[in-house]
Amino acid sequence: MTRVEYKHTEIAVKKKLGQNFLTDRNITRKIVAASGAGSQDRILEIGPGFGALTREILEVCPAFTVVEKDRALAAFIRQEYPQLQLIEADFLDIDLERLAAGGPLRVLGNIPYSITTPILFKLLENRRSITSATLMMQHEVAARLVATPSTKEYGILAVQLQTFCDVRYLFKVGRKVFRPQPNVDSAVISMVPKKNVAVEDAQAFSRFVRTAFHQRRKTLYNNLKDAYMLQAVDEGTLKLRAEALSIEKLADLFKLVQPLPAGEPPMKRDGRR
């Protein structure tokens, strides 16, 4: 079992929580600077750990909120930074809308590899409650977030986030600046919710995107025919794979299709059932 000690606290690293602690202060300074965080912001830090990022945020904002699930680390933060509002809980379980009742949140964090995708989707679902999110995550996941069409990285995650947020890959972080050292490199990204989006029904669009990318090697027709009415879509588009369409084209396609009523047979290419 790997153990990490800092000041008066020693913990057994929990792999299931994806715990890798950042040790390079230059990196934490870059993250805070890139976030644009200031004294007037309502800041939320996800998973402060031993406070590497926390102490840098305090340089620009004297009081903010942190969410920490690990009991020992929560006790450390409570003792080391009593001026902070500590929520000892799983970030995935907290009510972001309620937390943002006083104004939208600027989110920062070195987030666990193991739950990166659920965290991103929670932020996406609660995008009206945040100003921005500046997050460190596994490099491969960061690359998927900013992927472009017709690449192997381009998929559900890229489409969902880029439809509703401006996403930027900021910089890469090598694995040697963490304790314990992970087997992969990391990267820092930023996501800012868009004010105007091409899609109104986010949940319906999410279902559509998941269906369109369900089997990447299949055409849009084969992935969508059992779930949507496709009469309004030209045959040339239906012969393509989802990965070939830009964010804008997928949004346009979504507007053309209608969910297939329960019990209706799938659509044939000629428009008949």
From Swiss-Prot:
Q: Which domain of life is it from?
A: Bacteria
Where it sits in the cell: the answer is: Cytoplasm
Major site of localization recorded for this protein: cytoplasm
Is Cytoplasm found in the keyword set? yes
UniProt keyword Coiled coil present: no
| Entry GO CC | cytosol
Q: What PROSITE patterns would the database entry show?
A: RRNA_A_DIMETH (PS01131), SAM_RNA_A_N6_MT (PS51689)
**What InterPro entries does the record point to?**
KsgA/Erm, rRNA_Ade_diMease-like_C, rRNA_Ade_Mease_Trfase_CS, rRNA_Ade_methylase_Trfase_N, rRNA_adenine_dimethylase, SAM-dependent_MTases_sf
Q: Which UniProt keywords apply?
A: Cytoplasm, Methyltransferase, RNA-binding, rRNA processing, S-adenosyl-L-methionine, Transferase
Residues holding S-adenosyl-L-methionine: N20, L22, G47, E68, D90, N110
Q: Which GO terms describe its molecular function?
A: 16S rRNA (adenine(1518)-N(6)/adenine(1519)-N(6))-dimethyltransferase activity; RNA binding
Any idea of its EC number?
2.1.1.182
Q: Which Pfam families match?
A: RrnaAD
Reactions it catalyzes: adenosine(1518)/adenosine(1519) in 16S rRNA + 4 S-adenosyl-L-methionine = N(6)-dimethyladenosine(1518)/N(6)-dimethyladenosine(1519) in 16S rRNA + 4 S-adenosyl-L-homocysteine + 4 H(+)
Q: Which HAMAP family match?
A: 16SrRNA_methyltr_A (MF_00607)
Family named by the database record:
Belongs to the class I-like SAM-binding methyltransferase superfamily. rRNA adenine N(6)-methyltransferase family. RsmA subfamily.
The entry's function note states:
Specifically dimethylates two adjacent adenosines (A1518 and A1519) in the loop of a conserved hairpin near the 3'-end of 16S rRNA in the 30S particle. May play a critical role in biogenesis of 30S subunits.
NCBIfam families reported for this sequence: ksgA
Q: What is this protein called?
A: Ribosomal RNA small subunit methyltransferase A
> What is the species of this protein?
Chlorobium luteolum (strain DSM 273 / BCRC 81028 / 2530) (Pelodictyon luteolum)
